[in-house]
Amino acid sequence: MDVAFESPYWKKFQYICGVDEVGRGPLAGPVVAAAVIFDRYFEPSGILEQIDDSKALRHETRVLLSSEIKKQALSFSIAEISPEVIDEVNILQATFLAMNQAIEQLSPIPEFLLIDGNRFKTTLPIPFETVVKGDSKVFSIAAASIIAKVHRDNFMINLAERYPEYGFAQHFGYPTKAHIEAIKMFGRSKVHRKSFKLSCLGEK
């Protein structure tokens, strides 16, 4: 992926920030957002030319890319929102909260935001544009999706040591058949989202 999408924005702004989230759909664990700024007129080379939507990449490639993105980015930030907060405010608002926290932690402060998706609610006076399927179109959004995905996967792998009965290291909290069977057998843990109801278990 190249930086063709960012190029016209760099003519107006120095600090363009790509933002994406991962973990909206799982039954357990946090929603995670990442924000990434590259130098103005940055040209990806080497392994960074492989950057794509994180879902389209092999795990090993994502890990390598995440490390290299962190080295070459001007600034990056990651934010987590817990299952408790997700249950309190709903997953959409929790996603906005994660994205805003990631943006607020950046230095320098971005001048323009490119947000994956079709809507966003900002807490900062920074102009933005939402891009549907931005993680497959926009270099900086794809980079954010990769570091968010790797961060969350590692988080869930660590959780698997505390809650081995749920198989988090295999499905990362997503509603697979094995995960639903584990919930049926053991109930929900402290890291499960109580507001995500399973009709197959008779929950309403």
Swiss-Prot record:
A single cellular component GO annotation = ribonuclease H2 complex
Q: Which UniProt keywords apply?
A: Cytoplasm, Endonuclease, Hydrolase, Manganese, Metal-binding, Nuclease
Q: What is its EC number?
A: 3.1.26.4
UniProt-listed PANTHER family? RIBONUCLEASE H2 SUBUNIT A, RIBONUCLEASE HII
Query: Which lineage?
Result: Bacteria, Pseudomonadati, Chlorobiota, Chlorobiia, Chlorobiales
Where is it chiefly localized?
A: cytoplasm
Q: Which cofactors are required for activity? A: Mn(2+); Mg(2+)
Enumerate the catalysed reactions.
Endonucleolytic cleavage to 5'-phosphomonoester
Bound how, and how many: what does the cofactor note say?
Answer: Manganese or magnesium. Binds 1 divalent metal ion per monomer in the absence of substrate. May bind a second metal ion after substrate binding.
The name this protein carries in UniProt is Ribonuclease HII
Instruction: List, in alphabetical order, the GO biological process terms annotated in this UniProt record.
Output: DNA replication, removal of RNA primer; mismatch repair
Query: By its UniProt entry, which InterPro entries does this protein fall under?
Result: RNase_HII (IPR022898), RNase_HII/HIII (IPR001352), RNase_HII/HIII_dom (IPR024567), RNaseH-like_sf (IPR012337), RNaseH_sf (IPR036397)
According to its UniProt record, which protein family does this protein belong to? Belongs to the RNase HII family.
Q: Does the keyword Heme apply?
A: no
